[in-house]
């Protein structure tokens, strides 16, 4: 898929297929997480609209942000997480959406999720929820004997070289902050440094700091415990029946990834068309089946044909699981840099 998109980009750049004006009318540049939608939905969009999708991927919010801020590539549609959307709004990197051009989004994206989005998009002007979930511990029942109900298990010596941690500053530091009884949006530098030191102390036990690799390692049995997103958890349990997912009692992150349009987008109408297309129930269910991530689309559960997925407590959890969880907030550029420095300290120690 990536090679196909690069090929299309080269054609556009060379002017072989489109004039400059035509390219603006017949293309949309999308920047999304790795493997975060079914390629078939892009093909359906292109076939129906005649708009070519130039698709690029990133692995973390932090790696995505500089490319947008520096303006090296002018993407149209992006899919950041909650706190990163707030940061992009604060730094004038997004443009308000025209919801008159998003009728499907207004009809099928649950009001509860727009309400939750107000924590990072206070007026619901900039974002349309795409996926949501929690962060928890995936564990192998055959390798882990005790109940998994606390983040503390990730510091157990007996699981040395069996633990996978997220390679992301906020997702990694969130865990010791919760063990300390603090908010995952902590701004007290001494507390954050204490959380950093806990991660440094844990480091000899960690097999790897990973992003997308966690799923394959856990499915294959290469690790006994891993910090994963709930959508990955559903896919892992389907591939390996020995795996289970737990949300620790200390609390965790309730996250929302949403579609936004970049401030310097050159294909704004096409960007709206792309977002609204992805909100169609019949398209959303294809992406749900591909990803396993919980969806804010209120029609998907009824359309889902797989009874195991439809009744999955991971994909459609009891509201008690996430009602009292926190959403990441953007804490300002200075605090953002501070978090990143502490995470780099962990990585280099």
Predicted segments, located by residue:
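A ligand-binding cleft/hinge motif common to bilobed small-molecule-binding domains
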Residues: 84-87, 219-220, 225-242
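Short, low-complexity disordered leader/linker segments with a strong preference
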Residues: 1-27, 349
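Mature extracytoplasmic/periplasmic domains
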Residues: 262-323
């Amino acid at each position: 898929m990536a090679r196909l998109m690069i090929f299309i980009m080269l054609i556009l750049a060379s002017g072989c297929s489109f004039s400059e004006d035509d390219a603006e009318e017949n293309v949309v540049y999308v920047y999304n997480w790795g493997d975060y939608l079914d390629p078939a939905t892009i093909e359906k969009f292109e076939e129906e609209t005649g708009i070519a999708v130039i698709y690029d991927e990133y692995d973390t919010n932090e790696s995505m942000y500089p490319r947008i801020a520096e303006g090296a590539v002018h993407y149209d549609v992006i899919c950041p997480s909650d706190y990163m959307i707030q940061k992009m709004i604060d730094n004038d990197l997004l443009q308000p959406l025209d919801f008159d051009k998003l009728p499907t989004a207004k009809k099928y994206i649950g009001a509860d999720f727009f309400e939750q989005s107000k924590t990072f998009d206070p007026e619901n002007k900039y974002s349309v929820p795409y996926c949501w979930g929690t962060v928890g511990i995936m564990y192998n029942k055959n390798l882990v004997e005790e109940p998994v109900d606390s983040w503390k298990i990730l510091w157990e010596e007996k699981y040395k070289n069996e633990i996978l941690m997220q390679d992301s500053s906020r997702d990694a530091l969130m865990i010791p902050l919760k063990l300390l009884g603090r908010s995952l949006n902590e701004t007290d530098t001494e507390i954050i440094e204490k959380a950093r030191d806990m991660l440094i102390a844990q480091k000899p036990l960690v097999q790897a700091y990973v992003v997308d690799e966690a799923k394959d390692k856990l499915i294959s049995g290469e690790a006994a415990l891993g910090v994963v997103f709930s959508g990955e958890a559903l896919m892992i349990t389907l591939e390996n029946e020995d795996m289970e997912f737990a949300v620790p009692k200390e609390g965790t992150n309730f996250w929302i990834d949403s579609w936004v349009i970049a401030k310097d987008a050159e294909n704004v109408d096409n960007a709206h068309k792309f977002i609204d297309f992805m909100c169609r129930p019949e398209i959303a269910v294809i992406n749900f089946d591909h990803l396993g991530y919980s969806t804010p689309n209120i029609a998907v559960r009824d359309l889902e044909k797989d009874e195991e997925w439809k009744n999955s407590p991971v994909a459609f959890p009891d509201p008690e699981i996430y009602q009292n969880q926190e959403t990441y907030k953007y804490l300002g550029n200075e605090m953002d840099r501070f978090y990143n420095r502490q995470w780099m300290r962990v990585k280099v120690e």
